[in-house]
A protein has these predicted regions:
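Gly/Ala-rich beta-loop-alpha elbow adjacent to hydrolase catalytic centers
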Residues: 116, 120, 124
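Residue in the alpha/beta-hydrolase core beta-strand immediately N-terminal to the catalytic nucleophile
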Residues: 113, 136-139
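Active-site loop/oxyanion-hole signature of alpha/beta-hydrolase fold enzymes
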Residues: 75-115
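Conserved alpha/beta-hydrolase catalytic His-Asp/Glu region
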Residues: 150, 163-218
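Bacterial N-terminal signal peptides
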Residues: 7-15
Length: 219
Protein backbone atom coordinates (compact mmCIF):
# COMPACT_ATOMS: atom_id res chain seq x y z
CA UNK A 1 0.00 0.00 0.00
CA UNK A 2 2.83 2.36 0.95
CA UNK A 3 4.61 1.61 -2.34
CA UNK A 4 1.39 2.30 -4.25
CA UNK A 5 0.99 5.67 -2.52
CA UNK A 6 4.63 6.58 -3.22
CA UNK A 7 4.21 5.53 -6.83
CA UNK A 8 1.07 7.65 -7.16
CA UNK A 9 2.82 10.64 -5.58
CA UNK A 10 5.75 10.29 -7.97
CA UNK A 11 3.37 10.11 -10.92
CA UNK A 12 1.60 13.25 -9.77
CA UNK A 13 4.91 15.09 -9.38
CA UNK A 14 5.98 14.09 -12.88
CA UNK A 15 2.61 15.13 -14.26
CA UNK A 16 2.89 18.44 -12.46
CA UNK A 17 6.33 19.03 -13.95
CA UNK A 18 5.03 18.29 -17.42
CA UNK A 19 2.08 20.61 -16.86
CA UNK A 20 4.40 23.40 -15.74
CA UNK A 21 6.27 23.13 -19.03
CA UNK A 22 3.19 22.66 -21.21
CA UNK A 23 3.15 24.88 -24.27
CA UNK A 24 0.20 27.28 -24.51
CA UNK A 25 -0.87 29.99 -26.92
CA UNK A 26 -2.71 33.24 -26.26
CA UNK A 27 -3.47 36.62 -27.81
CA UNK A 28 -2.24 39.78 -26.12
CA UNK A 29 -4.28 42.78 -27.30
CA UNK A 30 -3.74 46.52 -26.96
CA UNK A 31 -5.03 49.42 -29.05
CA UNK A 32 -5.54 47.86 -32.50
CA UNK A 33 -2.66 45.40 -32.07
CA UNK A 34 -2.93 41.67 -31.43
CA UNK A 35 0.18 39.66 -30.55
CA UNK A 36 0.14 35.88 -30.75
CA UNK A 37 2.25 34.55 -27.86
CA UNK A 38 3.61 31.04 -27.29
CA UNK A 39 4.36 30.41 -23.61
CA UNK A 40 5.78 27.50 -21.64
CA UNK A 41 7.60 26.65 -18.42
CA UNK A 42 7.80 28.29 -15.02
CA UNK A 43 10.54 30.38 -13.49
CA UNK A 44 12.54 33.49 -14.41
CA UNK A 45 11.25 35.12 -17.58
CA UNK A 46 12.97 34.77 -20.97
CA UNK A 47 11.61 36.27 -24.21
CA UNK A 48 12.81 34.87 -27.55
CA UNK A 49 12.70 37.07 -30.67
CA UNK A 50 13.29 35.58 -34.14
CA UNK A 51 15.19 36.72 -37.21
CA UNK A 52 13.73 39.06 -39.83
CA UNK A 53 10.88 37.50 -41.75
CA UNK A 54 10.89 34.39 -39.55
CA UNK A 55 8.37 33.42 -36.87
CA UNK A 56 9.17 32.36 -33.34
CA UNK A 57 8.41 28.69 -34.02
CA UNK A 58 12.04 28.47 -35.16
CA UNK A 59 12.74 28.43 -31.41
CA UNK A 60 10.62 25.34 -30.62
CA UNK A 61 13.49 23.14 -29.42
CA UNK A 62 15.33 25.97 -27.68
CA UNK A 63 12.18 27.03 -25.83
CA UNK A 64 11.44 23.47 -24.71
CA UNK A 65 14.98 23.09 -23.40
CA UNK A 66 14.84 26.35 -21.46
CA UNK A 67 11.45 25.44 -19.97
CA UNK A 68 12.85 22.12 -18.76
CA UNK A 69 15.72 24.00 -17.11
CA UNK A 70 13.27 26.04 -15.04
CA UNK A 71 12.51 29.15 -17.07
CA UNK A 72 9.28 30.78 -18.18
CA UNK A 73 9.67 31.25 -21.94
CA UNK A 74 7.58 33.66 -24.02
CA UNK A 75 7.72 33.84 -27.80
CA UNK A 76 5.71 36.74 -29.22
CA UNK A 77 5.05 36.24 -32.91
CA UNK A 78 6.03 39.37 -34.84
CA UNK A 79 3.30 41.43 -36.47
CA UNK A 80 1.95 39.88 -39.64
CA UNK A 81 2.80 36.33 -38.61
CA UNK A 82 0.27 33.68 -37.55
CA UNK A 83 -2.40 35.42 -35.42
CA UNK A 84 -0.35 38.56 -34.74
CA UNK A 85 -1.90 41.66 -36.30
CA UNK A 86 -0.81 45.25 -36.53
CA UNK A 87 0.30 47.94 -38.97
CA UNK A 88 3.35 47.04 -41.07
CA UNK A 89 3.67 50.26 -43.07
CA UNK A 90 5.50 53.35 -41.82
CA UNK A 91 6.37 51.72 -38.51
CA UNK A 92 9.62 51.89 -36.52
CA UNK A 93 11.55 49.69 -34.14
CA UNK A 94 9.85 51.61 -31.33
CA UNK A 95 6.52 50.11 -32.42
CA UNK A 96 7.89 46.56 -32.49
CA UNK A 97 9.58 47.11 -29.13
CA UNK A 98 6.26 48.22 -27.65
CA UNK A 99 4.68 44.94 -28.78
CA UNK A 100 7.32 43.03 -26.83
CA UNK A 101 7.04 45.33 -23.82
CA UNK A 102 3.26 44.87 -23.61
CA UNK A 103 3.69 41.09 -23.68
CA UNK A 104 6.21 41.25 -20.80
CA UNK A 105 4.04 43.69 -18.86
CA UNK A 106 0.91 41.54 -19.20
CA UNK A 107 2.83 38.48 -18.03
CA UNK A 108 3.38 40.34 -14.74
CA UNK A 109 6.34 38.16 -13.76
CA UNK A 110 9.06 40.76 -13.35
CA UNK A 111 11.65 41.97 -15.85
CA UNK A 112 12.75 39.59 -18.61
CA UNK A 113 15.94 38.57 -20.32
CA UNK A 114 15.34 39.13 -24.05
CA UNK A 115 17.14 37.00 -26.62
CA UNK A 116 17.21 38.52 -30.10
CA UNK A 117 18.40 36.39 -33.01
CA UNK A 118 19.81 38.26 -36.03
CA UNK A 119 17.24 41.02 -36.80
CA UNK A 120 15.61 40.25 -33.46
CA UNK A 121 18.63 41.80 -31.76
CA UNK A 122 17.46 45.27 -32.87
CA UNK A 123 14.01 44.75 -31.40
CA UNK A 124 15.57 43.42 -28.19
CA UNK A 125 17.87 46.43 -27.90
CA UNK A 126 15.09 48.91 -28.58
CA UNK A 127 12.83 47.26 -26.01
CA UNK A 128 15.59 47.72 -23.43
CA UNK A 129 16.06 51.37 -24.44
CA UNK A 130 12.37 52.28 -24.41
CA UNK A 131 11.24 50.06 -21.52
CA UNK A 132 14.28 49.48 -19.25
CA UNK A 133 12.12 48.63 -16.22
CA UNK A 134 10.83 45.54 -18.07
CA UNK A 135 14.23 44.23 -19.19
CA UNK A 136 16.75 42.46 -16.96
CA UNK A 137 19.22 41.65 -19.71
CA UNK A 138 19.68 41.33 -23.46
CA UNK A 139 21.27 38.41 -25.32
CA UNK A 140 22.42 39.18 -28.86
CA UNK A 141 22.39 35.92 -30.84
CA UNK A 142 24.17 36.16 -34.21
CA UNK A 143 23.57 39.90 -34.07
CA UNK A 144 24.21 42.03 -37.13
CA UNK A 145 27.31 44.16 -37.40
CA UNK A 146 27.05 47.84 -36.58
CA UNK A 147 27.61 48.62 -40.26
CA UNK A 148 25.35 46.12 -42.01
CA UNK A 149 26.26 45.77 -45.71
CA UNK A 150 23.28 46.53 -48.01
CA UNK A 151 23.97 43.31 -49.92
CA UNK A 152 23.23 41.24 -46.82
CA UNK A 153 19.89 42.98 -46.36
CA UNK A 154 19.10 42.16 -49.99
CA UNK A 155 19.93 38.49 -49.36
CA UNK A 156 17.48 38.40 -46.45
CA UNK A 157 14.77 39.92 -48.66
CA UNK A 158 15.48 37.36 -51.39
CA UNK A 159 15.33 34.51 -48.86
CA UNK A 160 11.86 35.63 -47.76
CA UNK A 161 10.45 36.27 -51.24
CA UNK A 162 8.39 33.29 -52.39
CA UNK A 163 8.34 34.71 -55.94
CA UNK A 164 12.09 34.17 -56.26
CA UNK A 165 13.11 30.80 -57.77
CA UNK A 166 13.87 28.19 -55.11
CA UNK A 167 17.49 27.75 -56.23
CA UNK A 168 18.16 31.48 -55.80
CA UNK A 169 16.49 31.53 -52.39
CA UNK A 170 18.58 28.57 -51.25
CA UNK A 171 21.77 30.26 -52.46
CA UNK A 172 20.85 33.44 -50.59
CA UNK A 173 20.06 31.53 -47.38
CA UNK A 174 23.27 29.50 -47.67
CA UNK A 175 25.34 32.66 -47.97
CA UNK A 176 23.79 34.70 -45.19
CA UNK A 177 22.46 32.19 -42.64
CA UNK A 178 24.03 28.75 -42.99
CA UNK A 179 27.57 27.49 -42.46
CA UNK A 180 29.28 25.48 -45.16
CA UNK A 181 27.94 21.93 -45.19
CA UNK A 182 24.63 22.88 -43.56
CA UNK A 183 21.41 22.38 -45.51
CA UNK A 184 19.35 25.59 -45.91
CA UNK A 185 16.31 23.67 -47.18
CA UNK A 186 14.92 23.53 -43.64
CA UNK A 187 14.28 27.29 -44.01
CA UNK A 188 12.48 27.17 -47.34
CA UNK A 189 9.25 27.43 -45.36
CA UNK A 190 8.42 29.65 -42.41
CA UNK A 191 8.93 32.99 -44.15
CA UNK A 192 6.50 35.91 -43.98
CA UNK A 193 7.28 38.22 -46.90
CA UNK A 194 5.07 41.20 -45.98
CA UNK A 195 6.20 41.11 -42.36
CA UNK A 196 9.82 40.91 -43.48
CA UNK A 197 9.46 44.08 -45.53
CA UNK A 198 7.71 45.82 -42.64
CA UNK A 199 10.59 44.90 -40.34
CA UNK A 200 13.13 46.21 -42.85
CA UNK A 201 11.32 49.55 -42.98
CA UNK A 202 10.98 49.66 -39.18
CA UNK A 203 14.74 49.41 -38.79
CA UNK A 204 15.39 51.97 -41.52
CA UNK A 205 13.08 54.48 -39.82
CA UNK A 206 15.26 54.88 -36.71
CA UNK A 207 18.82 55.97 -36.11
CA UNK A 208 20.89 52.87 -35.52
CA UNK A 209 22.70 54.66 -32.70
CA UNK A 210 19.42 54.73 -30.75
CA UNK A 211 19.67 50.96 -30.33
CA UNK A 212 23.17 51.12 -28.87
CA UNK A 213 22.17 53.00 -25.73
CA UNK A 214 20.38 50.04 -24.16
CA UNK A 215 23.13 49.26 -21.63
CA UNK A 216 22.95 52.76 -20.18
CA UNK A 217 19.15 52.69 -20.17
CA UNK A 218 19.11 49.51 -18.07
CA UNK A 219 21.38 50.84 -15.31
Amino acid sequence: MRMAILSLAATMLLAGGALAQERARSLVKYDTIEIDVIAEGRGPLIVLLPSRGRDSEDYDEVAAGLAKKGFRVLRPQPRGMHASKGPLKDITLHDLARDVAIVIERENAGPAVIVGHAYGNWVARMTAVDHPNLVRGVVLAAAAAKKFPPRLSQLVSKSADMAVPEAERLAAMQEIFFASGSDPKIWLKGWWTEASEGQRVAAANVKQSDCFTFAAAMR
